[in-house]
């Protein structure tokens, strides 16, 4: 069942080898965590805007027409060079992966540390087959004792293609006397979050649901973290490590139970608490006769018809 879930998600392959095979061309290898790929498919190389067609593939040294994750795979890419697809790049199905400079994550400090992790500090994050310098902030605003876990926000020095659910390790940065020492390990919860206020209980609750909640709870939590801008179907699929059909079912359940609100066309989803915050000023504007803002009108009126015509929030 779990393998089926992985296979139904977008294909993603962090490249750990890239080389030229005489008579074949450029070959890349890696461990694909999710998705399916077949000969003839076009894959997006992240970071960047290059795309290459899969000319051939092998699994366990055997040629095949298609591959289903998880597992090791080698891909023969048409018209690509090793410079086009270097080690550290990520190959992904079109539109399924984000390049980001900020992520929310669950983090556990290793038990052997002499000192706790600071509330804010520079670190090196190793994720996929690459690494990046980052500023790490404890969202509690407090230090993290050795062996303890917390939610953090990582501000990356350069954009990386990162998926929800990815695991990573953290090492001390060049600015730290313990340079290169492994200090923590973690899991990405949100690959493209907003900045958060430190010590915000609503953020902590949503991240807790993303980390260990059921599928329905995780979708509700991701909608809540979108705040007033809301989130659409494509963004939910990019942010969550869940198959699209699971997200669709969770949205229907959340809407039916009043845990999620929907506005606009194409639809965007908001948390009920966010809608409540918007309703008060919207009603004031309506009472003043300010009906020129359809999104505000839709929120205030709570009308399916008005909501369908509303500009997305």
What are these regions (language model features)?
Residues 62-66, 79-313:
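C-terminal effector modules of nucleic-acid-centric enzymes and ribosome-associated factors
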